[in-house]
Amino acid sequence: MADGGDALPVGLPPRGGPLGRSRGRLSASALTTYLRCPRQWLLLYQAGMQGPTRPSQILGVVLEEAFCELLMMHPPEEVEGVDGLRHWALPLIVSLASKAHLAGERAWEESLWNVEDEAWSDLSLETLIARLQAGLDLFLVEVKACFDADGGPYLSSMRQGEQPFEVPAPCQSAPPSFPLPDKVPDAALRRWPMSESPVWQPQGAPVKWNEAWECARPWFKDPRVHQPQRLYHPEGWASGELDLVLRWDGRIRIVDIKSGRPGSAFASSLEHQLRFYAWLWHETHDGQHASGMEGWYLDGAARVSYDVPDADEINRLSSQYAGIHQDMQTMVEGVLPFPVPPDLACDGLAAGCGWCSLSKDGNGEWNGSTFLSLVQDIPNVSLNSPYQPLSFIQGRVAVKGRLTGTWGPLPNHFGEPVLGAVLVVGEQHITIEESEPGAFPTLHSHHEQDVVLLDVLPGVWRDQPRLYLDERSSMIRDGENKLQPPDVQFTRLGLLRTRANVTGHVLSIGGRSGVRVDGKPWSMVSFILWDGASIAEVVAFGSSINQRLLDLRPGDEIRMTGVEIGWRSGVLQLRIDNRKTRIETASKS
């Protein structure tokens, strides 16, 4: 096998954590949002407070997948020149654009909250065809360069049927490469019918144009792979999912695909995004530096290049990103107040700002632009019994007992491997576990000892109370008074609050569905509940999703009894249990 280097564009979490997004990790999108507006990041990534879906958001997803499917195709041997490749690809582009347009229409119809002044039908099929053609033209620049370089350094090995990279570029004639193949029980998902295959010339023959396409094909996110295809920082606190990596000439060039134009409101974030990817590549590839980083814009076929960070800049970025990650973890926790005073809101000028610009002054006057009319039209909430304000929900507590029954790491209810144990007080016992992988690695250090647990988070799972430990929690041996804060108030296990009765109005709502790492489907609905003073994310999974939830829209009133109390990254998250939670709704109209 030819040596293509350790150019692996995907990896596994170092502590075995979730492959997908995690609120505890720094990602490129979280970073760029934070750099634009920290409060926008707080509400979007910590509170889950989103805006309505726009056609452009769906367009970016379906276009990227269609473009990647095009790159997977195998040109015929007889094709000649760049124009010949364009002619061969045109009917494929029309078919892929039609497929993408239908997929976008379905996604638009299934979205729970869409903008009112735009519609998916505003995007014509011709628009998608033109942008896929633009993507093709951007790639053909690489194909021509590869042809002019006699196929590049890997032509000989590829003609012999060898794969120069451990993670190959996806193509029609090869099966998909899963990050966790053992988690895919369906063997059919791991195979791929070879309906077509590349045609290679004998060794020593001049390179053909179809071979240049095959050699120049980059790695990209394989649309056949349902598992996240990410890079993970060795220390576990950062991850990123690259769009495309060019490797054909022995260099590493990182590319991000954009469906719009370079002059969009979010365009200024591209350089920060690519610098993060270049830094992450360096951190995950034994100090290897990328040779280039580019943005490919499909509206107009624009290629925007940036200078790659050098060694000194990489070191500065490491410190900067670690500091930002730390600031994110300590920015806020518990129940989030909303609205905030004007001095805590943003000015609303950064791309994506909406909820973060809303504020209310001491005279009760609202300030902001986006969503201002929505919140102003919502009436005050009547908090009569049995309902209580969100701010009354019990946060961190202190408990003590005997630590026993240690276990793990084993999967929690999110499928994340965590450490756990049992805390026993008299005849009562409760399960305690890490809030996420690596959050409290010393959990087992006081096995079979009497301990004091400080700043732990109460929750519930399958109708049984639990306690969660994170980086802010602490454990000391009972009796070590010098380590115990004075006047600490302990909570009896039987008095831990695991459910709440809440009421308020819906501010935002969204739904997601997909396939888990093991190939099983999942679905989720989440909305932001506002009681007039605070907000909380409310989530429902699988069988807990009913038509009443799917019919909710911003401004609707909702009353819930018996909703589960949970925490994600220390921020309140309420969870609907179809067996225990009772729901009443009233439409704003």
Predicted regions and their residues:
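OB-fold nucleic-acid-binding modules
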Residues: 364-411, 464-518, 547-548, 557, ...
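A non-catalytic, helix-rich entry segment at domain boundaries
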Residues: 66-223
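Charged, glycine-rich intrinsically disordered N-terminal tails and low-complexity linkers that flank
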Residues: 1-106, 220, 226
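Non-catalytic protein-protein interaction segments used by genome-maintenance enzymes to assemble
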Residues: 213-274, 544-551
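OB-fold (S1/OB) nucleic-acid-binding surfaces
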Residues: 405-436, 511-542
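Short nucleic-acid-contacting surface segments enriched for D/E, G, S/T with interspersed K/R
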Residues: 394, 436-454, 497, 543-561
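Metal-dependent nuclease catalytic cores in nucleic-acid-processing enzymes
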Residues: 263-297, 450-454, 558-560, 565
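Metal-dependent nuclease catalytic regions and adjoining charged, substrate-binding loops involved
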Residues: 14-16, 209-210, 234-237, 264-267, ...
